[in-house]
């Protein structure tokens, strides 16, 4: 199952856990007291205190695991999940949206945010990290049309965090369908054909050779002029016979 990295105070990587495990934690009482305190502060109109309390919750990166820091160069493994956030909903909007989200076969997980007035939605895709932005935009458009509610566009970042929460009645479908992303095919890198290299002629050496060859020919011609070749009758004669005739 897809894994995520859990962070403390936004920056400190604690451990990697699967989305299944995290969903079980959210459905359990693990963060119940913290989340109920946050919602109580909001009900009292203490928004600042509620925000400070929420930021103390652990958070996880739904779309990938990271090494040490939550930066793209530190990305270790893409999870294959996109995360949507529908925030600041009325109770009626919450109820209606949750029911619709649960009927969509692409929905893997949906739970209430710690504030109690938002919904977190997790959708599995058939593409990788390279097409994360494209996948997000297509899923965002699909769910916004279904719900007639706008989602938070900041969740498009692959490094985006999601706070832990408490929602015993969350929706989870381990047999979800993958959302098929209409992504452009990756371009094939053309193979480079090696160009034959023509050896460079050393013109200086060539000229020296021609000069030397010309001198050699000239000397040979001069020698032949002073020493004409033997006549046909002398060719092949014994050297002793020749000397005897002198």
Name these PLM-found stretches.
Residues 1-80, 200, 204, 219, ...:
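DNA replication initiation on ssDNA origins
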Residues 1-3, 80, 98-112, 184-246:
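Long, charged low-complexity interaction segments
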Residues 2-10, 26, 30, 147-210:
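Catalytic "initiation/cleavage/transfer" segments centered on a nucleophilic residue
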Residues 42-49, 101, 105, 139-147, ...:
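Hydrophobic, Leu/Ile/Phe/Ala-enriched alpha-helical segments that form helix-helix packing faces
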Residues 69-74, 98-114, 148-153:
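Catalytic micro-motifs at enzyme active sites that drive phosphoryl/nucleotidyl and oxygen chemistry
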Residues 84, 102, 108-131, 135, ...:
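Histidine-centered divalent-metal-coordination microenvironment in nucleic-acid enzymes
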Residues 85-93:
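Short, surface-exposed ligand-recognition loops at beta-strand->loop->(often short) alpha-helix junctions
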Residues 97-100, 124-149, 170-192, 217, ...:
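Helical (often loop-to-helix) elements that flank the catalytic cores of nucleotide-handling enzymes
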């Amino acid at each position: 199952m897809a894994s995520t990295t859990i962070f403390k105070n936004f920056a400190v990587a604690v451990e990697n856990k699967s989305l299944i495990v995290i969903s079980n934690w959210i459905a359990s009482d693990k963060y119940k007291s913290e989340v109920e305190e946050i919602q109580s502060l909001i009900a009292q109109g203490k928004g600042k205190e509620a925000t400070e309390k929420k930021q103390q919750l652990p958070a996880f990166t739904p779309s990938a695991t990271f090494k040490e820091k939550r930066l793209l160069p530190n990305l270790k493994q893409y999870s294959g999940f996109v995360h949507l956030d529908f925030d600041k909903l009325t109770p009626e909007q919450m109820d209606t949206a949750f029911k619709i989200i649960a009927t969509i076969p692409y929905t893997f997980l949906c739970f209430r945010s710690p504030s109690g007035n938002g919904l977190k939605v997790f959708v599995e895709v058939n593409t990788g990290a390279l097409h994360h932005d494209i996948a997000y935009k297509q899923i965002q458009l699909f769910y916004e049309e279904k719900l007639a509610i706008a989602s938070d566009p900041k969740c498009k970042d692959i490094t985006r965090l999601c706070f832990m929460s408490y929602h015993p009645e969350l929706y989870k479908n381990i047999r979800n369908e993958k959302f098929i992303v209409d992504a452009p095919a990756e371009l094939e890198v053309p193979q480079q054909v090696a160009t034959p290299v023509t050896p460079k002629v050393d013109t200086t050496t060539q000229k020296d050779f021609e000069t030397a060859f010309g001198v050699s020919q000239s000397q040979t011609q001069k020698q032949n002029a002073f020493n004409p070749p033997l006549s046909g009758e002398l060719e092949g004669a014994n050297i002793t016979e020749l000397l005897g005739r002198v």
